[in-house]
Design a protein with these regions (language model features):
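Short, conserved charged micro-motifs
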Residues: 40, 144, 284-288
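Long, continuous compositionally biased terminal/linker segments
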Residues: 80-81, 275-294
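A short helix-loop-beta-strand connector motif used in the catalytic cores of GNAT acetyltransferases and
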Residues: 69-79, 257-258, 268-274, 286
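Short glycine/proline-centered loop/turn elements that form peptide/ligand docking sites
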Residues: 243-246, 264-269
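Acyl-donor binding region in acyl/amide transferases
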Residues: 50, 60, 97-257
Length: 294
């Protein structure tokens, strides 16, 4: 919880952030800012991000908690702001490929990028980095969590439209609390239902998942993506696990999402992460109406 003096500094700095407008789905403002220029806002994002990771059992070290790229101009912070409560609802870190050297992207440390990806995709792409929903908006139940995520996606939609973005790429994160079997099942599902069509990126140290395409074909026998997603949820329930919400969020955007290698991220307590790529033109019509219409 912010003390009054800290809150006042955050509110004051918010006036210098770039205002993208109000959410159509909740009474919150959407802003972006450069973390190096607005230190109090950046520290509040760090604080909330740290709390969010802590809730799922991930203890960030100092370098991960205070990531240098947050302040070096290579990326920007997207936040949803609850003006009535004077606090941040959630946030996303992002970097426009047209403005960023590939070696300054957060994905660079973990993946080799092909020349085709760098030349043909990156100039029209946005990299999605770490995201979070503030604890106060998680404890309000699934409704509060979903409207927070919805507002964040609305903000990303505005970035996509204003910057003429054609591709989204980033990583989905699977936390250790999921367990190895459930983690492998989720990664196998994604790589089977949303396979890579080109070798655009490859993990520097790939994670061995141990779930073959043949095995996935035997498990996921539905005729549609959603039928197979329900099969995944049923299999996860048998293990007393749930599918991470971010998986559902991404797969509901487009049927042509591509999933690449997974790897173990030691910087985040050995969480597993898998790279994904989405083509904006392939978004479902409902997604375009909800998030890309002005």
């Amino acid at each position: 919880m912010l003390v009054q003096e800290q809150r006042e500094r955050v509110v004051e700095e918010l006036q210098s952030a770039t205002y993208l407008g109000r959410s159509k789905h909740c009474n919150c403002g959407i802003y972006t800012f450069d973390g190096g220029r607005l230190p109090n806002l950046m520290h509040e994002v760090w604080r909330l991000r740290d709390l969010s990771y802590g809730e799922v059992g991930v203890a960030l070290d100092d370098s991960a908690r205070r990531c240098a790229s947050d302040c070096d101009g290579s990326c920007r912070q997207l936040i949803v702001w609850d003006g009535a409560a004077e606090q941040i609802v959630g946030g996303y870190r992002y970097a426009l490929g047209s403005n960023t050297d590939p070696q300054h992207l957060s994905i660079w440390r973990y993946y080799s990028l092909s020349s085709r990806f760098i030349n043909d995709y990156l100039p029209s792409a946005v990299e999605l980095g770490r995201s979070f929903v503030s604890p106060e908006y998680k404890c309000g139940g699934e409704h509060h969590r979903m409207y927070a995520l919805d507002a964040l996606w609305e903000g990303l939609g505005r970035v996509v439209v204003e910057s003429d973005v054609r591709y989204l790429f980033g990583r989905v994160t699977l936390y250790p609390s999921l367990g190895v079997r459930a983690r492998n099942l989720v990664v196998g599902f994604m790589r089977y239902l949303f396979p890579q069509r080109e070798e655009l990126v490859s993990a520097r140290v790939p994670l061995r998942v141990g779930l073959s395409r043949y095995r996935c074909r035997k498990l996921f026998v539905g005729e549609t993506i959603m039928e197979n997603y329900r099969i995944l949820m049923s299999l996860m329930r048998r293990m007393r696990r749930v599918v991470p919400p971010i998986i559902s969020s991404y797969m509901r955007l487009s049927p042509t999402m591509q999933t690449f290698d997974a790897y173990a991220n030691g910087d985040l307590g050995d969480v597993a992460e898998a790279a994904i790529l989405l083509t904006v033109d392939d978004f479902y019509d409902g997604v375009k109406r909800r998030y890309l219409s002005q």
